[in-house]
Amino acid sequence: MKTITFPVGYRPNYLLDFLHCLRKQNLEGWEIFCSVEASPQCIQLLEICDLKMNILHKPNSIGRQDHSGARANMYNALNSAFAAGSDFNLHLEDDFLLAPDAVDLANWYYENFKDKPLSYMSYGMFGFAPRGDDYTLLEEVPFFEGLGWCAFKENWEVCYQRAWWDESLAKKYYNAYGWDWNVQAYFRDSECKALRPLINRTQHNGRVGGTCCTPQHHDKHYAPLKWNQTERITEFKIIGVGGDTADRVK
């Protein structure tokens, strides 16, 4: 089973933009799991959307009484999908915009690596600044990018499920906190590799009211980025190794 997961918070305007993008994707053969905070407007949007989704309500017992927090909400979606039998998952967020071929890239990853899932630990959608003009190209990098990524069940069990709540390596390498820093530190400690497109297949849209991103940060680091808004690619090529951790912006 192939799955798509995403958390849902309290910003219906961004959720509506995201669902508009998601509905345009090639979703044949995919199950959708989303974990929802106690946001009536967002829950209503999901229920009236004509997508078949497993809508999970996140318990309020984690974090603040009225808000479980983004990390717990994401984990609930991911863990529920893999527990339900997912072999391969595309993880997105409710304040993303998606390229027309975002799920096509996920399908390509699945078809080309389903028999060797641990070739890479992350099969990514995003890489900050574009590197060239060829929409078909992918590159190998020695780090994790969190703005849209795919993982096989084996990747989930070996890396993400273990690292998600374990702060020890993030403190050791980065003196940082958060699920993505935990995963990044696991990549560094275990010398993991990832694939990512040279031109992004996701774009951050959540300028206001996010967990970490401020309007100033969004305007500086995300708004200027080139990402695929027009092309529909179904076949991709890996060109080699590129980038370094200097590409990453937090």
Indicate residue ranges for each PLM-predicted region.
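Peripheral/terminal regions associated with large enzymatic or DNA-binding modules
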Residues: 1-92, 96-250
